[in-house]
Amino acid sequence: MVAPKIRIKLRGFDHKALDQSASKIVDTVRRTGADVSGPVPLPTRIRRFTVLRSPFKYKDSREHFEIRTHNRLVDIMNPTKKTIDSLMTLDLPTGVDIEIKTVGGRA
């Protein structure tokens, strides 16, 4: 049977806060004795918006804005009860979205 695995996806606009959160998660998992893979940087999603500067005329004058969404992936192999408890109490900075999935079955 496949060993249990926890997959954590981190998303955020600030890559420094994202890397800091990923390193906190990796340190916590290693302290509890589970194996960790990552953080793996996933492709950054760039959303661009073009807006007219003037409300009435001067269509040639436009402004460009963009939002960059950075992504990281952390896999935890063979998590223990202690690992899950320590991840639940972990304090992470605001602005980081966390998605946690369990992959695989119980051994």
Curated annotation (Swiss-Prot):
Q: Keyword Cell cycle, does the record have it?
A: no
One short Pfam name that applies is Ribosomal_S10
Q: Name one GO molecular function term.
A: tRNA binding
| Keywords, sorted A to Z | Ribonucleoprotein, Ribosomal protein
Q: Which SMART domains match?
A: Ribosomal_S10
Q: Name one GO biological process term.
A: translation
What the entry lists under InterPro entries is as follows:
Ribosomal_uS10, Ribosomal_uS10_CS, Ribosomal_uS10_dom, Ribosomal_uS10_dom_sf
Q: Name one GO cellular component term.
A: ribosome
Biological role: Involved in the binding of tRNA to the ribosomes.
The UniProt entry's sequence similarity note says: Belongs to the universal ribosomal protein uS10 family.
Q: How does it assemble?
A: Part of the 30S ribosomal subunit.
For this entry, the protein name equals Small ribosomal subunit protein uS10
Report the source organism: Deinococcus geothermalis (strain DSM 11300 / CIP 105573 / AG-3a)
